[in-house]
């Protein structure tokens, strides 16, 4: 355990790896050497970091399968990011969470559409009732005998109530 946390040990292993790579590939024109060295360094670091982390996680956690799965997925996602990929590996739990979120949002939108549709139907019914109230009846049904000015055509005896409605009245106000 002391060697895992010892920085000098880790640095000496990295130096040893670099020296070994330099001796294997003595060609100074090797264009891929920095990439190979960085990949090996990342793999070594992941090896040194992941094993103790998994051991501690397994000892402290009660659901070891989920922790191991999460660690492995995290390691692969890190490797994919280092390789330049934008895609990531997701677990079934994350997919189920995303699906639940999508289904919940769809239900919310369906409820909103249902409310809006109900309101629109109510508005259409209200407009229909208003239209029915405002619709004009045909000319054949309207009694137009009282519509024209009867002052010139009827005499006092012919008025329906007995007096001319167009005759001005005298109004006296009390003081």
Swiss-Prot record:
Segments on the Cytoplasmic side according to the record's topology features: 52-175
GO molecular-function terms, A-Z: channel activity; metal ion binding; toxin activity
Carbohydrate attachment residues: 8, 18
GO biological process per UniProt: monoatomic ion transmembrane transport; symbiont-mediated activation of host autophagy; viral process
A Pfam family: Rota_NSP4
Domain of life: Viruses
TM annotation in the entry: 29-51
Location(s) in or outside the cell: Host rough endoplasmic reticulum membrane; Host membrane, Host caveola; Secreted
Membrane topology: Single-pass type III membrane protein
InterPro entries: Rotavirus_NSP4 (IPR002107)
Annotated keywords: Activation of host autophagy by virus, Calcium, Enterotoxin, Glycoprotein, Host endoplasmic reticulum, Host membrane, Host-virus interaction, Ion channel, Ion transport, Membrane, Metal-binding, Secreted, Signal-anchor, Toxin, Transmembrane, Transmembrane helix, Transport, Viral ion channel, Virulence
Main location per the UniProt record: host cell
Chain's role: Plays an essential role in the virus replication cycle by acting as a viroporin. Creates a pore in the host endoplasmic reticulum and as a consequence releases Ca(2+) in the cytoplasm of infected cell. In turn, high levels of cytoplasmic calcium trigger membrane trafficking and transport of viral ER-associated proteins to viroplasms, sites of viral genome replication and immature particle assembly.
Domain characteristics, as noted in the entry: Binds 1 calcium ion per tetramer.
Subunit structure as annotated in this protein's UniProt entry: Homotetramer. Interacts with the immature particle in the viroplasm. Interacts with host CAV1, early and late in infection. Interacts with host integrin ITGA1/ITGB1 heterodimer. Interacts with host integrin ITGA2/ITGB1 heterodimer. Interaction with microtubules blocks trafficking to the Golgi apparatus.
Designated name of the protein: Non-structural glycoprotein 4
Naturally occurring in which organism (per UniProt): Rotavirus A (isolate RVA/Cat/Japan/FRV64/1989/G3P5B[3])
């Amino acid at each position: 355990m002391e060697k895992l946390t010892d920085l000098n040990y880790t640095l000496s292993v990295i130096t040893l790896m670099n020296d070994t790579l330099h001796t294997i590939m003595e060609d100074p024109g090797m264009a891929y050497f920095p990439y190979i060295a960085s990949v090996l360094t990342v793999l070594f670091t992941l090896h040194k970091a992941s094993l103790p982390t998994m051991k501690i996680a397994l000892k402290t956690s009660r659901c070891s399968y989920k922790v191991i799965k999460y660690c492995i997925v995290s390691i692969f996602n890190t490797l994919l990011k280092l390789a330049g990929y934008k895609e990531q590996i997701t677990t079934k739990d994350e997919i189920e969470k995303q699906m639940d979120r999508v289904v919940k949002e769809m239900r919310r939108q369906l409820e909103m559409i249902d409310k809006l549709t109900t309101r629109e139907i109510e508005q259409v019914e209200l407009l229909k009732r208003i239209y029915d109230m405002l619709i004009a009846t045909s000319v054949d049904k309207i009694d137009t005998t009282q519509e024209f000015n009867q002052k010139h055509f009827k005499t006092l005896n012919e008025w329906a109530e007995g007096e001319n409605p167009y005759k001005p009245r005298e109004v006296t106000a009390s003081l």
